[in-house]
Curated annotation (Swiss-Prot):
Transmembrane domains' residue ranges: none
Signal peptide: 1-18
Protein name per Swiss-Prot or TrEMBL: Secreted RxLR effector protein 150
Compartments in which it is found: Secreted; Host nucleus; Host cytoplasm
Gene giving rise to this polypeptide: RXLR150
Length: 276
């Protein structure tokens, strides 16, 4: 009995000692709280919280800062911005999903059609003379812009020739609107000799296309359509100007000032709408 009582006493003494060491004292709690406060939530002299190296908010803030720093550099290396309409690359699950096949097939067909039209116009926009002929035939910047946007929109990723597409489009737009420099002079002038020579050198097919474009614009102008309506019909400002020249407007500026002013307003409206 004495041995049993002795063992029971030793057990209670050991248990009490373990509980005593495991229970935190008030001093240790205060010390630990101060340490955590000092490590995680320090405050500067202005009363603003200072993030620590292991703070999750600081890590996220640094990651956002790195993204904002690297993004402009990535765009500069690419030389061109991805079109906002460009479709992101489809995931494997999306490709295997039969429900997405009709849409993907439709996108492929529209992309092929846009590429087909682009190939047809390559010879028509390869140099300054070919661009001049295309303008006389009624090719407008809006037509090229639609082809460009379709290629970017229906491609599953950035087209491999994205930079060239943008460059060719910008070259055509610059040369197109450069033809109106004489229109805004006082008095307005039109370079007739250049276009008469190009017209004489055209093939019979090209001359038919040119006359068709002039007749089409003539019908719209004679009907008195507003500028908004003319823009919606994609009436070429250049063909419009050539129509006035053929009607002798620029030979008698004083008596045709209203027609010339209407053309000026339309050219500006067309350019503004194109840049939207």
């Amino acid at each position: 009995m004495r041995n049993i009582a002795f063992l029971i006493g030793l057990f209670f003494i050991g248990y009490s000692s373990c509980v005593l060491h495991a229970t935190p004292t008030r001093a240790s709690l205060v010390e630990k709280s101060d340490a955590e406060s000092t490590h995680v939530e320090q405050w500067d002299s202005n009363g603003k919280r200072t993030l620590q190296a292991d703070d999750r908010e600081r890590i996220l803030a640094e990651e956002r800062g790195m993204e904002q720093t690297l993004l402009p550099a990535a765009e500069a290396i690419g030389k061109t911005k991805v079109s906002e309409k460009a479709v992101s690359r489809a995931s494997l699950g999306s490709k295997l999903n039969p429900m997405t096949w009709p849409k993907r097939i439709l996108y492929k067909i529209k992309l092929w059609y846009a590429r087909f039209r682009q190939n047809l116009l390559k010879r028509a926009t390869m140099d300054e003379e070919s661009i001049d002929r295309s303008m006389m035939s009624g090719l407008t910047p809006f037509a090229l812009k639609k082809i460009k946007n379709d290629i970017f929109h229906y491609s599953s990723s950035v087209p491999r020739d994205a930079i060239k597409i943008e460059k060719d489009y910008n070259s055509y737009v610059d040369q197109f609107f450069g033809q109106f420099n004489g229109l805004f002079k006082d008095p307005p002038v039109f370079e007739m000799a250049k276009w008469k020579k190009l017209e004489a050198d055209m093939t019979s097919t090209e001359q038919i296309v040119e006359r068709t474009a002039l007749n089409k614009v003539s019908q719209y102008i004679d009907k008195g359509f507003s500028n908004e309506k003319l823009i919606s019909l994609d009436v070429s400002p250049f063909v419009y100007m050539r129509l006035l020249e053929k009607r002798g407007v620029f030979k008698d500026v004083e008596n045709n000032i209203d027609k010339i002013e209407h053309l000026k307003v339309y050219v500006k409206a067309y350019e503004e709408h194109l840049m939207v």
